[in-house]
Amino acid sequence: MKKMKFVVVMAAFAASLGITSCLDTSSSGGTGTLTWPFKVSSDYMTGKTIFVDEADNEYIPTTAVTVSGDRSDLAMVSFSYDYEQFATQGDRKDITVLGTPEYLPKGEVSGEVIPEEGTVSLSGFNTQSLLIWGYNDYLILNPLFYVHESTVSETLDTELKNHKFTLYYDAATKAENDVMKLKLRYQILNVGTEDALADYTKSYSYCYVYFDLRSAIRAYP
């Protein structure tokens, strides 16, 4: 019962962040699928890639996997599992990875104030588009923004590199009433003039970006 609750909680978080899930939590067992952000690690015995969740549970792929993209701390992983087995395996759980896991891009955390000038507003952003991973370890965002109207699938990766997300705090001030304020800034790089922003008309929401909150917390006075 305790393990079932753990899976259901993961599904609830997944729904809030727009992550897909399909869980069979019936008492007779069954299978389920889930897409979830994990920390990427390696098995101390085999050296193979494994995944770790917020509670330090380890997820062991049944076959060797390679994570695509630029290496970072977190990856988005789609997997299936046997429910009865999953519920009894303790803190090391067997999973069947579906597709190729992808590293999440890491956003910059800055101690310098970033003025609003030169930044762009985000569309459709709310608290349901974010997730605190672990005990204030990482902040994961799923923002909606606009890419250039000429963007096609072949040029998407290049276009996305021009969209920069920065989380900043004012290192020169102390927390007010013991509350640390973090602010998000969104910039589109390599735009010649402000008028050129009118050409950014294609909405894009299939992007996840994470920030390492630990660095900000450690540095804050």
Locate the predicted segments by residue.
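Bacterial Sec-dependent N-terminal signal peptides
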Residues: M1-F6, M10-S42
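First exposed extracellular module after export/assembly in secreted or surface-exposed proteins
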Residues: G32-P221
